Amino acid sequence: MHRVMGVDIETYSSVDLAEAGVYAYVEAPDFDILLISYIFDDWGEDNVKTIDCFDADPDMMAEFCEALLDPQIVKTAFNANFERTCLAKWLQKPMPPEEWRCTMVKALTLGLPGNLAGAGEALGLPPEKLKDPQGKALIRFFSKPCKPTRTNGQRTRNLPQHDPAKWQLYKSYNRQDVVTEQEILRKLSIYKTPESEQELWALDQHMNDNGVALDIPMVEKIVEYDTRRRQELQEEAQELTGLKNPNSLAQLKRWLAEQGVEMTSVTKDTITEALRDPDLPDVVRRVLEIRTALGKTSVAKYSTMLVAHCQDHRLRGILQFYGANRSGRWAGRLVQTHNLAKNTLPDLALARELAAEGDFETMGTLFGETAFVFSELIRTAFIPSEGCRFVVSDFSAIEARVLAWIAGEEWTLEAFRQGKDIYCETASMMYHVPVEKHGANSHLRQKGKVAVLACGYQGGVGAMKRMDKGGTIPEDELQSVVDQWRGANPSVVKLWRNCEMAARTVIEEHRTVRLKNGIAFGYVNGNLFIKLPSGRKLCYWNTHLKMDPRDGREHIVYMGVNQETKQWGETETYGGKLVENITQAIARDCLAISMQRVAALGYNIVMHVHDEMIVDVPIEDTDALERINACMGEAIPWAPGLPLRGDGYETPFYMKD
């Protein structure tokens, strides 16, 4: 057994941590560590030591640093990425993630909140073990720059001598964070983390530490021009409408009414609908076009790049391990690479070249309003390291493949094995006629496509509408499409029922229920666990059945973080939603294994988005694409019979092929 040291630090930097992320935060010239609290697992829970870095005890500092740099001692922290990055910068020593364990990730794997205070409260820790609520004010006082005033002598930073009483409170706060982290760790110690997940987290940390290169000169030109262009559009809107503030919805709606255009609401969708009207007055059309252009917030991602990039023009820390705690998938941070506009420009490379040259006049002439072009160029700001190119490889239709595999929908699996178009095959099964993409009954392919994307997780008409954004299927046909898809996929429909029945059974009877392909439902300490084929488990905290007076039925309810409100509370689930979680979790595990295989070949994965990975590859390595695609398509031992395929391409900048 390794000795374990729990760590928490308080720091100072003039860079905003929330806006820039920890990697840019520690590069500020004034970055410093103020307080360090630590405890060893063999000391007893009340023996936390605190180092005041302004007046450090040399013996304590030596003890801490010796343990920190000892590879035989395991270090734990809540959000260990922060402690690792700060301590590495402060000591100018590497902090290998293999020596660390992240208590936040442990909490996330169990469906708990990803913040120390929230996790402690969700676990019902006693008051003396909870995070100190005074912390935010103390952090603002000591860890961030202060506004110079006559009262404070025009200083821009508060030091311990400026308020000794507050400083003592800050030391107590720092100590209490270790107490809370250790109590959370103790409470969760009965739930073992697979070693494979720890290895994957270490790979994730290396990826975040390495980061991805950005074309900063191009980004700077885009931000500078966009600022000017937005001002021009604002002035044009004022001139056309005569309004002091055309951004005001109330003012704009009154003006529209005066032009004979009644719009009950002015949203992206209603503006798009209005612009389709050939009889729309020209002045109204132009004003609505301007409003749409000014509403493009994607340019904010370029501003984030400028704030968050490091001195070597690399962006780090853009992936949060286990950020989606229902499936264990990664979540985006800072630039939010999981939420980027599609590439639809006829010549993306030319548009990018014009942006890099700062020739925005030609760009506007060739491609239209620059705000929309900039939205599509965000991906292209990510560039390979010097002497490299990107190889981008992703799983082809991974969720549809996994869903068919866990359900045992053989016709779908066979279609994938034969390399057929799944949308055509689905439409063919639904309507009992041959369907070819550019041939017989090709008009049915769109129905097959929308159904594949909308119906797999018990989706109905509402899901069809969300997927069919262009309204290609008449509304009165949607229910029929849903029914046809369900009729063609009886094994998937059965899987929804089986998963819901399994969950209800384990909640009521507290026993294990096993399904196909290594999936098993269990119930431990009031929590529902779903074991995946990989051996990883999904957790639904405090799962129970609860009567809903609206329909008189008992629903499956668990405690979780609401994806919209971000608040901890009761959340309902059902068969189709459980199938969605399982499918996406297995897809995530497939990507994880593929990334580990690619990394084992010596390749440098700079980031991954959904089901694709982006790899920095030396230009002279001409076999890389084939080798990386092979890793993606290689069979996985715990998923026999799952047909996987990697599709990839090479590119001098990130893009969607």
Which residues fall in each region the model found?
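Short active-site loop/helix that positions an aromatic residue
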Residues: S13, N81-K93, L110, R254-E258, ...
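Conserved catalytic palm subdomain of right-hand nucleotidyl-transferase polymerases, strongest
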Residues: G6-V7, F78, E99-C102, F382-I398
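Conserved "right-hand" nucleotidyltransferase catalytic core of DNA-directed polymerases
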Residues: M1-L17, A28-F31, L35-S37, D46-N47, ...
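Active-site palm subdomain of RNA-directed nucleic acid polymerases
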Residues: L188-L200, C590-M613
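A common structural junction motif
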Residues: C631-A639
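A short acidic-Thr-Gly-centered motif at the start of a beta-strand
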Residues: M1-R3, C65-L69, V373-R389, Q596-A600
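Active-site-proximal helix-loop-helix substrate-binding element of RNase H-like nuclease domains
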Residues: A28-L34, Y38-S189, P346, T426-Y431, ...
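Generic long, charged, amphipathic alpha-helical segments
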Residues: I422-S442, D551-V606
